[in-house]
């Protein structure tokens, strides 16, 4: 009236095979989600930096700004991230836009570069493993 031991073992083997096929696919989705997460954090830092650049330019309106006029600590505070995670912040030659910004979360590095043409990037955001 119940299942035999052989039938239960067959069911368990089938479940194990299905799980073995799904785990690599799920791992890929997890990696993509982690990449999207660091891109979102980097985008937040870039938007904060651009906001501060626009505010500073509006105050002075004297032309070119320098990176030193926009402290990384202010960018991190506005983006609500740790200032130690932001590096390589630079303005474009006109001093009016973010040219580059690198964000590190401890495992991966995301670099913002609007001129990026890399095929493995998400537009202006390039994610790589931390060295």
Can you say where each PLM-predicted feature lies in the sequence?
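Aliphatic-rich helix starts adjacent to a transmembrane/signal segment
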Residues: 26-46
């Amino acid at each position: 009236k119940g299942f035999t031991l052989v039938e239960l073992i067959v069911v368990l083997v089938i479940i194990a095979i299905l799980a073995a096929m799904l785990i690599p696919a799920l791992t890929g989705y997890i990696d993509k989600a982690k990449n999207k997460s660091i891109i979102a954090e980097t985008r937040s830092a870039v938007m904060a930096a651009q906001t501060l650049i626009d505010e500073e330019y509006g105050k002075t309106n004297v032309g070119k700004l320098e990176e030193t006029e926009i402290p990384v600590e202010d960018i991190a505070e506005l983006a609500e991230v740790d200032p130690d995670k932001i590096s390589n912040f630079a303005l474009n030659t006109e001093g009016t836009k973010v040219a580059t910004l690198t964000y590190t979360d401890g495992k991966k590095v995301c670099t913002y570069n609007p001129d990026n043409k890399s095929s493995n990037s998400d537009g202006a955001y390039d994610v790589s493993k931390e060295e």
